[in-house]
Every structure is written in structure tokens, then in C-alpha cells.
Amino acid sequence: MNNKVNTRDFIVVKGARENNLKNVDIDIPKNKFVVMTGLSGSGKSSLAFDTIYAEGQRRYLESLSSYARQFLGGNEKPDVDSIEGLSPAISIDQKTTSHNPRSTVGTVTEIYDYLRLLFSRIGKPYCPNGHGLISTLSIKQMIDTVYENKEESKIQILSPIISQEKGTFKNKIEELKRQGYLRLRIDGNIYSLDDEIELEKTKKHNIDILIDRIILNNDTVTRSRIYDAIEKSVKEANGKVIVLVDDKELFFSQNHACNECGFSIPELEPRFFSFNSPVGACKSCNGIGFNFLPDTAKIVPDPSLSIKEGAIAYFRSVMMTPTMDLKREMSVWKEHDINLDVPFKELSKKEKNIIFYGDEDIGELKIDVNEQSIYSSSSFLYNNGLVNLIMRRFSETQSERAREYYEKFMSNLSCPSCNGQKLSIEALSVKINNKNIIDLTEKNINDLTNFFIELELNETDRNIAHLALKEIVDRLSFLENVGLNYLTLSRSASTLSGGESQRIRLATQIGSSLTGVLYVLDEPSIGLHQKDNEKLIETLKKMRDLGNTLIVVEHDEDTIRASDYLIDIGPKAGDFGGEVVAAGTVSEVSENKKSITAQYLSGKLKIEVPSKRRHGNGKTIELVGASGNNLKNVTVSFPLNKLIAVTGVSGSGKSTLINETLIKGIEKKLTNPFIVPAPFKDIKGLKNVDKIIKVSQDPIGRTPRSNPATYVSVFDDIRDLFANTKEAKARGFQKGRFSFNVSGGRCENCSGDGLIKIEMHFLPDVFVKCESCNGKKYNQETLQVLYKGKSIYDVLEMSVVEARDFFYEIPEIKRKLDLMVEVGIDYLKLGTSSTHLSGGEAQRIKLAKYLQKRATGKTIYVLDEPTTGLHIHDIAKLITVLNRIVDNGDTVIVVEHNLDLIKCADYVIDLGPDGGINGGQLVAYGTPEEIIEKKAVSYTGLFLEKNMYKDK
């Protein structure tokens, strides 16, 4: 009997042992929508990404030449016996698409490429000086325009060969003389080529060849002379002609050029509209859209102070003993009678401009360089102002410390030349339906789709553009279908959340219409409101229906229930996971008694709605008039000593309200005057807060040496313990001996890494276990010091829960490890490198550290989507931890979409009603029950009701 699985229908994995996987065998059906779920850290990603996708990628790389492989890396075979039936694999994970400021939603999705093509084919250039449509002219059309003037007019036909260029142009003038030309018009004056012409090298010049002088008559000879002269001018000046008719000057061009002012643009081609090409980019900012410049908001961070009180932060430390720079500035302020004793905000606009940008018309002022008096007798020529002064000092200094000081007063500010639009004035002059290409990229996806659907074109343009238009509209609709209708194409890719980046790549893949591909996705529902979840699920099904296999690592219940096949990894996390607990349809898995996921799916386990909501301490923080990004003058109160959930559809303004306005606004007032929050009018109730802490999902350390034990400071206590053993004292070992970061106790062969990097040149670098320490990071003498039979390396290899039991009798160590267990990271090894931690794990490690601190009752903790990467069982633990912080007297604000967390909040602030320009309003606020009452206007209320009362 042949039990071999047909690899045409299944991906057959045998003996997967990557990370914590325990010799996993699994048959995954092809051309199905497969979801892998399980507790956080159970091994889902190890199976999906580190095993199945990694092997698919390795096989592809193996097919390339060794020369190509050296540039790609990453062809190490995963720890698995075999994988059969594997298709070409594409990973769509949560990593931010790009940190390059040039990368935007438009470039990542390739929609901008089609826009560039569209504008180069049917775009119409307009004069930026208000002279209307620019068109190309034939020589006949030029002559016809000349003949619109009265007969007997004196006309001169000139060829503009040099326009606003520096130089003496001696060689050019000599060449024109040899060609037989007699006269030139230089900077408006006529010169004979027989004259000695001397031009200033540093000055910009205009040089025109005088081709012919003619009396305008409507006879054949005159018309022929005009034709010949214009034709010659066109050849010499690359299509341009100037015709002087009496005192009137006419400008003509065979290229795109304005007849009135001469503004011209080159032939339209796609790269002309690229801010990544020198041809199209703004020359001032090189296509980035911003420049690093002095920021008036940082120079004067607190305008309620007077200048004498230190309003100007740049001079704050020298107000009592003025420096030369300050003396110069104050001399100018005195000249303009600027009052140094009134609050800076009460100065007039003109006075502020003088302070920031100087007064070039003021001439010479006197100052004494030797005395403390600020009004004096030595003269200097003034033209600075603080902005110019700081910019000059920043540009000229060679000192790194000085540069860091000047940078405190500088920001990336919108480029004044292109107003942040990245392109040259010529490219921005080309329009379709009165909109330039950047105008279109600044529309949200919804509005942009409608613009192209409703676009009216003549038959010729429609025939030219229909293919490009179809691609644009199709790709925009794919973005809408994954819930990104609030984004703009101009949005920088580096500002996108992990979930947004992943869904953009998802939309791009749909646009490619590939078939027979294995897609591996990591929680595509992250950051997505329940309102848009159905669209996302339909998109995933559409990818499956194209003939692809989808393996989706996911915790979202709706996505799990929509799957064709469900694989539950567990039963728990870390060393207690790594097994396939259940596999089959959702209904089959739901009946599995060993699966924690099954217990939640069947309703046997669930996160209960709290029996009562906390009333708080009666104090509030009120944010008044928040108007950053799409926020529409929002005023909102945050009741303190409560668990507050800030909700709303994707793009409604939650992150702007909390991360960019509330956090930065409070930090500016309390700790960092140089920080620049999004615009708001006021924050009331600051006396009720001593600090605000953002518990982000950023890594806990920048190097692989950082680990959970060092971050929560428990490793310090453990090293103290080892240093106090009899063996350590006998050998004279101090606490530092047990650190793998400094010389002494660490293995010097691998510098405490445990691994040695071997460069393979034409192959990827290989990391091998250090032979000196056998991968244990420490030298032999250090490892001989034991505590209860375990070395310091053995302790780092323990899981948190194992370490807690091991150090049960040491209260300080046990207390810190108890907190790590409480936040749900009991499965992590103490020595796990920070680079191997997920964002959710990093966030929970930070929570464990903050829980060590004594509550003040005045601290606000902010978490942005803390349920990212968490199984519902882990979310229950997280809610317990957040409740503990609030019960201790502090306040917790979570920006969240997860309904199980939202329903456990004491207070909900719901923004909306939709995303982008259709969001940014306070839709509802109050308890979850009060939000449900507003379900007619609140999408959150609508879905919250379904979640809270689904059993009723």
C-alpha cells in the first residue's frame, strides 16, 4: 500500500527542527488559504518563515551563479529533513518597506511609474507665470504671428543661444565671428563682433545672435527673408527664436515654451516627472522635498518668555554675558526698537522676521568687541538673523560637538524652492485636468480613483492613455481592497506601520497576477479596523483563486474562521511549544481538547467583559485644538487612572493624536523644549502628570549583545550572586568578570559572542561556533564558577520560568522574573539576543521593566497596538498587566483595533468617521457601552456590540 502524499496537492514537510520546532511533520494543502496560529512564541514563524519560505528562497538562490549569490546572501539550509512539493515562495512580512526618504507609496506600488508615463504622453504644459497653455509652434505659425503686426514695422530676428549663464564666452564669441555673424545682443545691448567684447566671469549673461533686420511687408521676398532668418535661429538656439517688433518682444519655440515670457520645458518623457532623476528633481532639495534647516519653533521653543527671560534657546546660556554673535543681533534689535522684555509671542510679525532673518538694508552698525556693553563703537556689516547665523555656523564648523549643538535648533523643513513637491518647476507646470502630478499623489486613494474614473479626455488622448489608466485604476482599487483607501501616493514609505507596509506589498502582488506561487504572510490584519477586515479576507481569497497557496500566520478570529485549513502550533510557547497540536478545517480544530486556540474558537475560553469600569481619580489631561495631519481641531480629555483605548478606522488620526501630539506635547512641556509636536493650541492639567512613557515595539537594544536579562536588570543581580560565591571570592573575581561585554571573563577569541564570523567572499558569511569556548561566550576560568551547580552561561540558557524556579530563594531576582512571567514571556531564554525578539516580545520586556518602578499616580504609559503578534490567550495576560498598572494608580493609553482589549477599557476615545481627509474628528467617547450607543456614527461601536454581546 502506498501512503506517500501526492506532492502536486500538498507541501510535505518532514523533520522541521528550526528554533523550537520539535521534529515537525506536516502536510500543507496547496492552492488553499492556510492559517497557522498558536500562542506567541509557539513556533508559527519558525515553521512558516524560517523553514518553508527559507527553503523555497534557498532553492531559488541555488539556481543562480556563484557570482550572483555573493550579492544576495541567505542561502543557509533550514534545519529540516526534507520539504517536497514546494512552489516558488514570496514572503510578505511586517518589515517597513524602506527607510529611504525617496521611497513613497506611489513608487513602491509602481503606480507613480504609470502616472509618469501618463503625464509624459497626455500632460499639457502651462506657464507658471500665468500666461496659460504652452504649445509648440511650427515656423509657419511663428511667421503668421509676426504678420499679425502692422506693415512697415521694424523687426529684428534674434537667436537666443545663451540664457542666464556665467562666463566670459570668449571662445563662443570668436566662433560666431568665424561663422560670419556681425552683431550680438548681450544683456539687452547690441554689440558688433568687430568690437572687443569683455564680459564679467561671475555675472550671468544673456547672449542673442542678431540674425536679420527687416521692414515688415507682405511680399514674397520679405516673407522668404523672415522664414530663412527664423529657420537659422531655430537651428542655432535649439528651436528658440526672439522677434523684436518695434519695442515689443515676441518669444517663439518649436519646443514647449511660453510666447510671452520665454519659460520653456524640454520634451516630455517619463523621467522628467521622476524626483529620483536629475532631469526632473528640484535642484534645491535634489528631489527629497525637504532641507535640513534652522527651525524657528526650536530656536524659540517657548514664545511665552521674553528675550531677556531666555525665549531664544540658542542664546539662553549667554544672555547675561553676551557673545559676539549676540551683541551683533542685539545691536540690530536696538536699531529697530525691539522690546526685549515682552513675551516673544507679542512681538509683531515684522519684528520676528528681523530676529529670524535679519535686515539686509540696515547697513553698518557699531559694536565694541572689548567691553561687555552691547551698544558700542566698532563697526560691522549686518545681514544675519538667527536662521542665517545658525545655518552658517553649522556649515562652517569642523567640531562634531558643535554640529550636535546646532542640530538642536534644526529640522527637516519643506524645501522653499518646490514647496516640498520634490520636482522642478518645469515638471510641476505640466497638468492633466488642471492638476500636476504631485497634486494627484497628494489625494487619498479614494479621491484619486474617482479622479481617474471621472476624467474626461478627447478621443486622441483617450486612445493614447487607456492602457496606463487601466493599470492605475486597477492598482488603486487593490489598495482600497486591503483597507488603505486613506493613504496618499506621496506618503513616505518610511512612515508606514508594519501592517500598512505588508498590505501595500500584498496589493502589489495582486497587481502582478502571478499563479502557482507560495505566499507566506505575517499577520496581514495588524493595524486594520474590523470594518476593513472583510475586504482583506476577500483579497486573500482572490489570491488563492488565482491558483496560489497562502500560508498566513495570524491571530485574528475572522481570518482564522475564513481559512480553508488551520494549523495550530503549540501547545504553549518557547521550549513548551514547537509541535503541531491540531490541523484541519476550522470545525475540526475547534473540537481538539489539547488546543488552547480551539478552546477560544469553541467559546470554552474567552476574555470576559469587566463587571465594572474604574472611575479614575477625577483628574484629566485635556488636549485642545489638535490639528496635525488630518485632525480637525480636535479637543479631547483623557481621564487619569484609567485604561483608555484610542480607536478608529485605519488613517483616522489616532497615531497623530497620541504619538505626534499628546506625547510630544507633554514631553515638550515637561522634559524636552526642542521637540516639535504636531500643531495644537494647549494642554490643560499638566500638573496631574510627571512623565509620559511610550512603550514601543522597537528593539530593546541596538546590538545582538543586548538580551532580556540585561534589559530588565536581572542580569546585574545574577552577576552579583556569582561574584559572591566562595569560588569567585577565592579567585578574586568581581562582578565585571561575569559580563560577556568586557574583557576579563569573556572568551577573547570570539569577544563574548560565542560565534566566529567567517567571510566566504563569493558565498554568504558563515557563523561557526567558537572553538575556544564552544559557543559559551566565557573563558574556562569564569565557567568554573558555579552557583547551585550551574555556570553563568547555563543561567543565560534558562527560560524565564526555569530561572525563576532556580532563583526561587533570591527575592530580588525572583521578583523581576515574576514580572517577566506575568507579562507572558516566560518561555524566552534569558540570553536571547535582542535581534531575535519580535516587536511584541520587546514591548512586553519593556513592560516588565516599567512594572519594577514604584507607581507615582502621575505617569501615563502609551502603547501603540500592543496586541500585535499576540494570541488571544496572550492578550488576556496583557490585559491583566495593563490593569495592574492602572490599579497601582497610573494611567494607560492604548491605540488599538483589537476588540477584546477595547471592551476591557474603562474609557474609549473613537476617531473617524473614516480615514484620511474623511477622518480626524472625535466621533464618540465614554465607556465601551456608551460607544456602542453611538454605533450609528461609530464603526467601532458597531463591531464592539457584536463582540461584547455575541453570545446573547
Swiss-Prot record:
Bilayer-crossing residues are none
UniProt entry keywords in alphabetical sequence? ATP-binding, Cytoplasm, DNA damage, DNA excision, DNA repair, DNA-binding, Excision nuclease, Metal-binding, Nucleotide-binding, Repeat, SOS response, Zinc, Zinc-finger
Mapped zinc finger ranges (C4-type): 258-285, 747-773
What Pfam families does this protein map onto? UvrA_DNA-bind (PF17755), UvrA_inter (PF17760)
Q: A Gene Ontology MF term for this entry? A: DNA binding
What is the recorded function of this protein according to its Swiss-Prot or TrEMBL entry?
The UvrABC repair system catalyzes the recognition and processing of DNA lesions. UvrA is an ATPase and a DNA-binding protein. A damage recognition complex composed of 2 UvrA and 2 UvrB subunits scans DNA for abnormalities. When the presence of a lesion has been verified by UvrB, the UvrA molecules dissociate.
What name goes with this protein? UvrABC system protein A
